[in-house]
Amino acid sequence: MLIRKWKAGLLAGLSILALASSADAGEVRMTVAEYSAKTGPYFEEVKKAFEAENPGITLNFEVVPWDVLLQKLTTDISAGTNADLSIIGTRWLIDFVQQGIAEPLDGYMNDEFKGRFIETFLSPSVLDGKTYGLPIAASARAMYYNKDLFEKAGIKNPPANWDELKADAAKIKALGGENYGFGLQGKEIETDVYYYYAMWSYGTEILNKDGTSGLSTPGALEAAKLYKSMIDDGLTQPGVTSYAREDVQNLFKQGKVGMMITAPFLSNQIKEEAPNLKYGVAAIPAGPTGARGTYGVTDSVIMFQNSKNKEEAWKVLDFLFQKDWRAKFTQNEGFLPVNKEEAKMDYYVNNADLAAFTALLPDARFAPVIPGWEEIADITSNAMQSIYLGKGEPDAVLKDAAAKADAILKK
């Protein structure tokens, strides 16, 4: 795991942070995660507008694909050539804080600035009472459904629970052809998360109250058996473990999947790539007791502690988190608003898709901000792949995964 290697390179001490980031005086550099083809052009607009308002500061962005972002940061930090600012997955933040890499931002923020944010999305970046990151991207997860397939299959409403989902998926399968009831992700980023949706609905959390893994609990087992039964009954697309999130989304956009769970950015993709597709957005199905959960996600901007231009870097952050620039970014990428004033804009208030996601926020869980989280997520993903492929009985696979996760949690 990259974070483990990354930690190992820094455990010798924090002398690396004494190395200056390579920005010149008056220059601010920011590493940016690429969310879509719109990301780069947006930040070019920001650069032009910011430099026009701040003639003494040069602003440069480096846009990096998500799948290599952590490796890029690892390399730059190890060499002392990191930028002044960077977007990171908030779930990585604790590692950056523990290694003294992220600068606390509270000393730069006044009440007006802090008051811009919706607390739900700012709080994951607060550790031990200090704010180390600002939420630049936020989303939750909900269930998309294909209205045309529902109509053909005689389904009137989206399923309220997993039993109804299985029944509806069977009706869609019965239509024949390349029609799949439920799109199930089985590889790459968020394979573990797709499992958590069912796990949460069966009353199980990722971590038990005593801090141990929840993977060996009865609810975790029932959730795994649920997904495996859908695979065995042919209610999902074939070859689940060869489908990443984007692959399942593509099947949905092609009109081949009746239901799938994903983020609000799919709505933007449908409007641009499949404008004739009739779809709806509904809550993730509930479990036997009515419990349900969605995945809340934030990405944060951090300031590096070794930045030579912190005051200038803060000006960039203040600029980026103004309402109009936030709204343009959020709407381009299909995220949820993190700015209170932005959330009041007509675009959000009158957007039925986003309203469906917002309604689920009271049930949102965020990835635990704990050391070793990425390794634990990998363990969970690998376990689910083994179960989906039939390489082991769910009970045994989950107990083994829980033991591996607990070993990390005890470190």
From Swiss-Prot:
GO molecular function terms attached to this record: maltose binding
Cross-referenced PROSITE patterns: SBP_BACTERIAL_1 (PS01037)
GO biological process: maltodextrin transmembrane transport; maltose transport; transmembrane transport
InterPro entries (alphabetical): SBP, SBP_1_CS
Residues of the signal peptide: 1-25
Top-level taxon: Bacteria
First-listed, main subcellular location of the protein, grouped into a coarse class: periplasm
Cellular component aspect of the GO annotation: ATP-binding cassette (ABC) transporter complex, substrate-binding subunit-containing; periplasmic space
Coiled-coil stretches noted in the UniProt entry, renumbered to this chain: none
Alphabetically ordered keywords of this record: Periplasm, Signal, Transport
Keyword Signal attributed: yes
Subcellular location: Periplasm
PANTHER family: MALTOSE-BINDING PERIPLASMIC PROTEIN, MALTOSE_MALTODEXTRIN-BINDING PERIPLASMIC PROTEIN
Subunit architecture: The complex is composed of two ATP-binding proteins (BAB2_0493), two transmembrane proteins (BAB2_0490) and a solute-binding protein (BAB2_0491).
Protein family per UniProt: Belongs to the bacterial solute-binding protein 1 family.
Its job: Probably part of an ABC transporter complex.
Name of the protein in question: Putative binding protein BAB2_0491
Organism: Brucella abortus (strain 2308)
Biological classification of the source: Bacteria, Pseudomonadati, Pseudomonadota, Alphaproteobacteria, Hyphomicrobiales
